[in-house]
Design a protein with these regions (language model features):
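Residue-level recognition of phosphate/Mg2+-coordinating polar/acidic sites
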Residues: 47-60, 75, 80-84
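Mobile "lid/hinge" segments at catalytic clefts and subdomain interfaces of large enzymes
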Residues: 31, 42-49
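Residues forming the flavin
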Residues: 1-36, 66-240
């Protein structure tokens, strides 16, 4: 295959060709609320959402209308020992997401932002314990007041090596082991229409392990993705 892979790298990364769901709540996702605080994380989520809307995202948000129906779903979940986490969802769609990112990329270029593709970063330039820039495999050095390493899953091994080389402390995050389960539309219809993606959590009785529903794709299809380190993962797609 291609190296680097144009499906999992490039502008917007794997997100450009994914289902494109925006979870508009700090209660789900990563550790941003722990780092910046809940209110600041919520503020940044809304700021990012506004950018998506500016470049053409669907205005419809799931999970905020028909309160009585959502409460009925919550009651059913409780009876099944499940916890329903409230989370508004905006769905971009597999066939629309990359168009939004294309408009965003074109806007950045028109605004004078230089984007370098097919340019491998060899190292981070550190001076007096502070990241000052990056060095490419072509020997070019780029300096900036702030360096953001948006490496995703594809660049995790590279970034781990960089951290070890520069003595940067790291800690392992939670690793979720997931499976894709296909069911008929009729079974999921109520959840899909009211919530689009039902955030359901279950704790196992023996070891209290957390099990959660993640990345559902209503009326969609399962697809495999392969990363450069040989890792095969299962993704899903859903169209508008």
């Amino acid at each position: 295959g291609c190296q680097p892979c144009s499906i999992t790298t490039g502008f917007a990364g794997a997100g450009a060709f994914s289902d494109g769901k925006l979870s508009l709540s700090p209660d789900v996702g990563g550790t941003l609320p722990e780092i910046l605080g809940y209110e600041k994380a919520e503020e940044l989520i809304h700021e990012a959402d506004d950018i998506y809307l500016k470049f053409g995202a669907d205005k419809k948000v799931y999970g905020i209308e028909d309160y009585e129906a959502i409460e009925a779903i919550r009651t059913k979940a409780i009876r099944a020992n499940l916890k329903l986490i409230e989370c508004p969802i905006r769905h971009l769609g597999t066939e629309e997401g990359y168009k939004i990112y294309t408009r965003l990329q074109e806007h950045l270029i028109k605004s004078g932002v230089e984007i370098k593709f097919m340019t491998m970063v060899k190292n981070i330039l550190v001076e007096d314990g502070v990241a000052k820039g990056v060095l490419t495999e072509q020997g070019e050095a780029f300096y900036a007041p702030e360096i953001v390493a948006g490496i995703g899953r594809e660049g995790s091994e590279w970034f781990s090596h960089i951290c070890k080389e520069h003595g940067i402390d790291t800690k392992n995050g939670t690793v979720d082991v997931g499976v894709r389960v296909e069911v008929r539309d009729e079974i999921m219809k109520e959840l899909n229409e009211k919530l689009y993606e039902a955030k359901l959590v279950y704790y196992t009785p023996t070891f209290d392990d957390k099990v959660r529903v993640f990345c559902t794709n209503p009326s969609g299809e399962v697809a495999t993705e392969y990363y450069d380190d040989g890792l095969a993962v299962v993704n899903g797609h859903a169209y508008k």
